């Protein structure tokens, strides 16, 4: 959620939407992702999401829907990408490869096929943005993933919600 562009091209921190967290945690659980990190520099945004996570994992919601509880246990809140990378490195004993995603094309992109091979060999941190995209120049990354392309060929429209992009990318990486 930071740093991202708003619709006017200004660098901002976008608001965290609770249903993004719930849906993406469910996707993560479905595809065997070890952890879902949500990065936001503002305490109030992290606290709001923490209350939702706690309701479903420790509060009354844990009795209502055990699947949601299990999925939301994957969520980790952080104030910076550096914290996330250090946490993964501590747990995996190796620094993760950081994968930048964007709807825009860029030279030297990694293909889904190549990333699918890397996922088997190395810890991967895939960055998904909100708003009008992540600020490429402010985020250290190892590879940029090719964008999701629509149908039919030549369809330039690809302004997807973060939930949709996550679902498509995880399916492409972990499908049989």
Where in the sequence are the language-model features?
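Conserved strand-to-helix beginnings and helix N-cap segments that scaffold or border functional pockets
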Residues: 49-50, 112, 159
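Alpha-helix boundary/interfacial micro-motifs
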Residues: 49, 57, 119, 146-147
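Surface-exposed, flexible loop/turn segments at secondary-structure boundaries
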Residues: 4, 44, 106, 132-133, ...
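RNA substrate-binding interface of SAM-dependent RNA methyltransferases
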Residues: 1-103, 167-170, 174
């Amino acid at each position: 959620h930071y740093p991202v562009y708003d619709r006017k091209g200004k660098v901002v921190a976008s608001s965290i939407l609770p249903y993004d967290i719930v849906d993406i945690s469910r996707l993560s659980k479905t595809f065997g992702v070890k952890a879902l990190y949500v990065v936001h520099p503002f305490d109030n945004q992290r606290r709001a999401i923490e209350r939702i996570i706690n309701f479903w994992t420790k509060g009354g919601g844990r009795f209502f829907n055990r699947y949601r509880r299990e999925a939301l246990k994957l969520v980790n809140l952080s104030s910076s990408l550096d914290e996330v990378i250090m946490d993964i490195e501590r747990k995996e004993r190796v620094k993760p490869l950081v994968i930048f995603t964007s709807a825009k094309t860029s030279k030297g992109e990694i293909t889904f096929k190549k990333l699918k091979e890397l996922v088997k060999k190395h810890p991967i941190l895939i960055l998904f943005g909100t708003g009008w995209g992540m600020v490429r120049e402010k985020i250290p990354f190892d590879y940029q993933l090719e964008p999701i392309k629509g149908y039919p060929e030549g369809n330039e429209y690809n302004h997807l919600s973060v939930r949709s992009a996550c679902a498509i990318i995880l399916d492409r990486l972990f499908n049989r």
